[in-house]
Amino acid sequence: MGALLDILLVNTGDKYPAIFTDNIIHMLEKTGTKYDKIHIITDEQYEGVWNKLQLFRDFKKGPYLYLDLDVCIKGNIEHLQREELHILHAWWRTRHHTPLNSSIMSWSGDYSYYYKVFASNPEYYMLTYQGIDEFIYNLDKVVYKTYNPVCTSFNWHGFDEQWDVILFNQAYHKMTEYGPWSKYMLFDVEPNMDPITK
């Protein structure tokens, strides 16, 4: 049996209240997903999503599984562990500026290449690309692989319960409102309640 996963989360700035990190832990435990430790990056060194690149600077052993905070976990997700760096292929939408989605990533080993390139000229990369997905996709050196479809997007397909993971992404505020996802989450909401904001 291999080593247990370390779960990685990023919660910088004031976009997500602390309950969103607690919610991930709640869903992992509820689904019986086994892990060793949870690491949460809270140091806001850059703007918004660019802080996720700190993951590659700080975590060079593994195995790791990174999750965005705006996901609903319905089933055990240990099967998402990968040795080589894997990023989501956003099969659920048109390509836009990149076909990648970094809401879920897994790896073992040293992928600090991504952080080092970015840190060499962060202002340039933040102005040139809309986020780390486009940044990673456009680098000359390709050192990642993409998952086969392992999740879906609430924004594009609604709350499709056939998947173990549903991404909410820009609709993260819906997670704190009552819906079919509520039974999986920590947010204690009932029909006709106001959304949770703390």
Where are each of the predicted segments found?
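Short, hydrophobic beta-strand segments that form beta-sheet elements in well-ordered domains
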Residues: 34-42, 63-70, 84-89, 144, ...
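Catalytic core and acceptor-binding pocket of nucleotide-sugar-dependent glycosyltransferases
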Residues: 108-198
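N-terminal anchoring/stem segment of glycosyltransferases
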Residues: 1-49, 60, 169-198
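A short acidic, often aromatic-flanked loop/helix-cap motif at beta-alpha or helix-coil junctions
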Residues: 44-49, 94-95, 149-157
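Short, polar loop motifs at secondary-structure junctions
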Residues: 39-45, 69-78, 148-152, 170
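GT-A fold catalytic core of metal-dependent nucleotide-sugar glycosyltransferases
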Residues: 48-99, 106-107
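A generic structural signal for well-ordered coil/turn residues at beta-strand boundaries
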Residues: 100-101, 162
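A structural signal for well-ordered alpha-helical segments within the folded catalytic domains
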Residues: 22, 50, 54, 130-138
